[in-house]
């Protein structure tokens, strides 16, 4: 076409040949049918817009087109979501850790029941990062296996630098969730086998291998749980024996549901056989399995605090970890207040009857290493020989107070006697180790408080004597020193009246306390003291006001007297001046000058009188009362 004349720069368009030129397609573009091509420059043809103007956005051309596009986009989105959910459906795994986080309110409630506090972030850190490093089988996602929880608790409660006292609340809460599981934990907890009663008459069976425990748990009661142990096979008795007596045989002991300071988390106790115990009925030996307790591992203590059942058989109950934790946190240290901690340990020794291993656990939890060594040393010093005096024989000391685990069977009378003697020596060691070096300044620093009774003050004074001096305040030889300290260090009002007592030397300490109680009880109450102070203040104000008024009246009276004298003096002087002036004035003639006393002119015409301007007349002064 370049060779055609007058066609350079021409634009070719398609002319539609449709019978309906105004009809549009689906997306707004006009349909292109067969046609012919003409030059734009032909003025006889109709001008058509370019195709770009026909193919505009679908949203501006047709509502149906917009509806179709939205439907396509929505279908694609639904298909994508369906594929994503179908791929991930069934892949969510619930772990003990995630389960506890989902029910965190219940976990906090369980911790509160154990008297401990926990934090969510610390909970996740210990479960996923800290406890898996103990190498006891703890998974990173947590577990409710009581055996694994027990091993972690042993690690946490280890004495010395290997222990983790800050993790005690968390492992105690884990153990509580596994021991008494909520409904959302029960599907993840292994079922517990029924507790097995060990009667005193049982034939011996091969012992089961003990659960492996780390060596550092040798001083603690066994914390292994029989949750995963299989029930032992029943041994058929002799067919010639009598049948079982179901009416007279005692049922197995159940766990005490009541709260106790020693069986809070204790597992099901096993009954220890008693030597020489007779059968409860002649038919017991028929169908009752005879067993001997399994051989204990050398690194695991199988002794627990003793408790006697209803049938005279001893059961063992472990110390509750929450009780140990509360005893440690709710009492001062042995160095700060040895008397209070000694009283606590004494009550535990008397009520729980702990074994040698339990005593070591108790000392390791409540005392530091140095305090424990000091207590053990003082206890060994308190061992007495056959003559009743402290002995120095190593054999006698080791027999009475051994440092290594002895072979004392608490099921025998001899073993229980050893344990009783051991507890007595341990208590004596606590009392002797609690005494501080002699410091009389500490004793003199004990003074009676403003509202403290004399009896309470005397108890504090005696406790200071026991703690800071080697003297016993209950000794009659020390009564005089205690009495003098009681008088001098009492409250000022009580001390002054006690010092003025007649025949003070013959008064005993009890007499002084009774006199001090009388003085203390006669003290005015705070209300009476306030009323007395108010009354004294009012009287003092009235007396001061009266004195001020009397002083003011006396001052006014004195001023009036002085003023009267002054006025009388002034008046008398003026009168005398008036009388004297009248007598001294000479008689003038009618032509005599009053100024120069010459005759022939008057005073106004006197040449000797000065003619200058007259000065101001002096003003008379007025006397006031202040002058």
Curated annotation (Swiss-Prot):
Glycans are attached at residue 113. Glycosylated by host. Cleaved by host near the middle of the molecule, releasing the c-terminal half containing capsid and nucleoprotein domains op GAG. Residues 1-63 are cytoplasmic. It holds the Pfam family Gag_MA. GO terms for cellular component: host cell plasma membrane; membrane. Residues 199-215 have a biased composition (Pro residues). The chain crosses the membrane at residues 64-86. Coiled coil: none annotated. A zinc finger (CCHC-type) spans 593-608. It is a single-pass membrane protein. SMART domains: ZnF_C2HC. One of its GO terms (molecular function) is nucleic acid binding. It is found in: Host cell membrane. Residues 523-555, 575-608 have a biased composition (Basic and acidic residues). Residues 87-627 are extracellular. Residues 199-310, 523-627 are annotated as: Disordered. This is Glyco-Gag protein. It comes from Friend murine leukemia virus (isolate 57) (FrMLV). The lineage of its organism: Viruses, Riboviria, Pararnavirae, Artverviricota, Revtraviricetes.
């Amino acid at each position: 076409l370049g060779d055609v004349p007058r066609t350079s720069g021409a634009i070719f368009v398609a002319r539609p040949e449709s019978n309906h030129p105004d009809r549009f397609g689906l997306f707004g573009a006009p349909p292109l049918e067969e046609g012919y091509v003409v030059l734009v420059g032909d003025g006889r043809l109709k001008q058509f817009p370019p195709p770009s103007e026909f193919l505009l956005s679908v949203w501006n051309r047709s509502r149906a087109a917009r509806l179709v596009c939205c439907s396509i986009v929505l279908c694609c989105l639904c298909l994508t979501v369906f594929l994503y959910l179908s791929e991930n459906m069934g892949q969510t795994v619930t772990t003990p850790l995630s389960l506890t986080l989902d029910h965190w309110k219940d976990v906090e409630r369980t911790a509160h029941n154990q008297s401990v506090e926990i934090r969510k972030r610390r909970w996740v850190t210990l479960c996923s990062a800290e406890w898996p490093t103990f190498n006891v089988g703890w998974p990173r996602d947590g577990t409710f296996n009581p055996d694994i929880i027990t091993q972690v608790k042993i690690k946490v409660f280890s004495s010395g630098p290997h222990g983790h006292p800050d993790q005690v609340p968390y492992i105690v809460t884990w153990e509580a969730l596994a021991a008494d599981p909520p409904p959302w934990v029960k599907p993840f907890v292994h079922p517990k086998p029924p507790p097995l009663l060990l009667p005193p008459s049982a034939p011996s069976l091969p012992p089961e291998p003990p659960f492996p425990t780390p060596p550092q748990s040798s001083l603690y009661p066994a914390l292994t749980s029989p949750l995963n142990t299989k029930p032992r096979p029943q041994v058929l008795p002799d067919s010639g024996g009598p049948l079982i007596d179901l009416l007279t045989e005692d049922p197995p002991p159940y766990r005490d549901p009541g709260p106790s300071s020693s069986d809070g988390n204790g597992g099901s106790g096993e009954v220890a056989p008693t030597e020489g115990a007779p059968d409860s009925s002649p038919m017991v030996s028929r169908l009752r399995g005879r067993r001997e307790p399994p051989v204990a591992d050398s690194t695991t203590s199988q002794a627990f605090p003793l408790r006697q059942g209803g049938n005279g058989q001893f059961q063992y109950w472990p110390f509750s970890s929450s009780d140990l934790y509360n005893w440690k946190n709710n009492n001062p240290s042995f160095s700060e207040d040895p008397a209070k901690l000694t009283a606590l340990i004494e009550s535990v020794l008397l009520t729980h009857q702990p074994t040698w291993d339990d005593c070591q656990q108790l000392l390791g939890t409540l005392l530091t290493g140095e305090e424990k060594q000091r207590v053990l040393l003082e206890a060994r010093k308190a061992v007495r020989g056959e003559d009743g005096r402290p002995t120095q024989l190593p054999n006698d000391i080791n027999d009475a107070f051994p440092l290594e685990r002895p072979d004392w069977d608490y099921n025998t009378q001899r073993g229980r006697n050893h344990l009783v003697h051991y507890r007595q020596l341990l208590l004596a060691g606590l009392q002797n180790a609690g005494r501080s070096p002699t410091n009389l300044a500490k004793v003199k620093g004990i003074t009676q408080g403003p509202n403290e009774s004399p009896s309470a003050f005397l108890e504090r004074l005696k406790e200071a004597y026991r703690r800071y001096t080697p003297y016993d305040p209950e000794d009659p030889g020390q009564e005089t020193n205690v009495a003098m300290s009681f008088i001098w260090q009492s409250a000022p009002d009580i001390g002054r009246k006690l010092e003025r007592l007649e025949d003070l030397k013959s008064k005993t300490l009890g007499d002084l306390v009774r006199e001090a109680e009388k003085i203390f009880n006669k003290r005015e109450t705070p209300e009476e003291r306030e009323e007395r102070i108010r009354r004294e203040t009012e009287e003092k104000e009235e007396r001061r006001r009266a004195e001020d008024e009397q002083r003011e009246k006396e001052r006014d009276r004195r001023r009036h007297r002085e003023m009267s004298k002054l006025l009388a003096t002034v008046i008398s002087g003026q009168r005398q001046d008036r009388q004297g002036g009248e007598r001294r004035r000479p008689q003038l003639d009618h032509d005599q000058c009053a100024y120069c006393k010459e005759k022939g002119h008057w005073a106004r015409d006197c040449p000797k009188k000065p003619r200058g301007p007259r000065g101001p007349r002096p003003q008379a002064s007025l006397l006031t009362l202040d002058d």
